Amino acid sequence: MSKLCQITGKKPMMGNKVSHANNKTKRIFNLNLSKKRFFIKKKWILLKVSSAGIKTINKFGIEKTLKKLNFNVKKKY
């Protein structure tokens, strides 16, 4: 899935767009995703992360976060 955070696992949500007249139409609430590079074990990896994922990495560190998720760094992303 292309619109998926690789850290938190969040994906787009479905909901209703409500007008002033209370008419409801379906819409998608997309994530605030960005491609971000991180330096781990003498090399750069590219992750697609949401803003919540970036906050998690800033709080705990990239290595501890990836270890908690059993993320394989050897694969190319």
Swiss-Prot record:
Pfam families referenced in this protein's UniProt entry, alphabetically: Ribosomal_L28
Record keywords, A-Z: Ribonucleoprotein, Ribosomal protein
Keyword Ribonucleoprotein: yes
GO biological process, one term: translation
Gene Ontology CC: ribonucleoprotein complex; ribosome
Annotated GO MF terms: structural constituent of ribosome
SUPFAM superfamilies: L28p-like
HAMAP family assigned to the protein according to its UniProt record, in alphabetical order: Ribosomal_bL28
Protein name: Large ribosomal subunit protein bL28
Organism: Karelsulcia muelleri (strain GWSS) (Sulcia muelleri)
Recorded name of the encoding gene: rpmB
